[in-house]
C-alpha cells in the first residue's frame, strides 16, 4: 500500500472556546464530546448530533445530520492538510456541503479541525433536547453494539424529484 494513514483519535481531540459562541474542535474529537462541551457552555445548535457515533472530522467530511439538523448549519470553517503537506482553511460556503457530502470527498484533503458557531441557549432546554433525541435513537437503534454509521439514505428529495418527472 502506498499512501499515508492518519489516525484521528484521542491525540487529536482538543476542543476550546474561541469566543462566546464559537467552538474550535480537532478532527478526532467525538461528536458526543463536542455536544457535551456545547451544553456546558450553554450553546445550542448541535443537539441533533448528540449520539451520532463518530468524530468531528468524519461529521464534516460527510455533513453528518439527523433530526432536521446538519453540520452545514453550524460549521463556519475547517482546516485540512493537502497531499503536498500544506495546511488549508476552507470557509463553510466553499465546502459544497449537501446531503451527506462535502468537497472533502473529492479533493483528498484530510480534515484536521472545525470551527462551529452556535447560539446562546438555556442549559435545561439544550439538555432536554439532547435527552429527547437520544431517547428516539435508543428506541430505533441497538446503541449497545458498535456502529458503522447510517445504512439508510433519506430519499424524500429524490422521490419528490422522480415523482415530478413522472407527472411532467
Task: Report residues per predicted region.
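Conserved active-site and cofactor/substrate-binding residues in soluble primary-metabolism enzymes
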Residues: 10, 29, 33, 47, ...
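N-terminal glycine-rich flavin-associated loop
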Residues: 7-43, 70-89, 118
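A short, glycine/Asx- and small/polar-enriched loop/turn
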Residues: 1-3
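Phosphate/pyrophosphate- and phosphate-bearing ligand-binding catalytic cores of soluble enzymes
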Residues: 81-168
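Acidic/polar active-site rim loop that often engages polyanionic ligands
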Residues: 16-21, 60, 109-113
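Short N-terminal helix-initiation segments at or just after the protein's N-terminus
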Residues: 20-25, 50-60, 95-98, 139
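A gly/ser-rich beta-alpha-beta helix-loop segment of oxidoreductase catalytic cores
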Residues: 32, 38-76, 82, 147, ...
